């Protein structure tokens, strides 16, 4: 397997909220899309040029959120053939997403 360069384009996190709090009416994929769009904007690249997104997501509350990272990447403007990798590891989700991407 050829070595591939992993580039951290930028790091952005969502707002911090409590369960059932001010973000309760926002779909997780919509919140994720906002975060991904901002990460891409800070990186200064075209969303269609990003081929892989690693997303940390904590505690999906409904089975329809099983593919939240995929929906979020598409809603953020990434290409349909891009890869969306989702990690759900409670408080360690974001850090595990970075580690797993590097592997």
Model-based region annotation:
Residues 1-82:
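Conserved "HGTGT" condensation-loop signature of ketosynthase/thiolase-family condensing enzymes
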Residues 88-103:
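Active-site-proximal alpha-helical scaffold in enzymes
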């Amino acid at each position: 397997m050829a070595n591939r360069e992993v580039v951290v384009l930028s790091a952005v996190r969502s707002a911090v909220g409590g369960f059932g709090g001010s973000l309760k009416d926002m779909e997780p994929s919509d919140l994720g899309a906002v975060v991904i769009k901002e990460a891409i904007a800070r990186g200064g690249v075209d969303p269609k040029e990003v081929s892989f997104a690693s997303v940390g997501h904590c505690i999906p509350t409904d089975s329809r959120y099983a593919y939240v990272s995929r929906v979020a990447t598409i809603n953020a403007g990434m290409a349909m053939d891009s890869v969306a990798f989702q990690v759900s590891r409670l408080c360690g989700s974001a850090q595990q997403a970075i580690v797993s991407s590097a592997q």
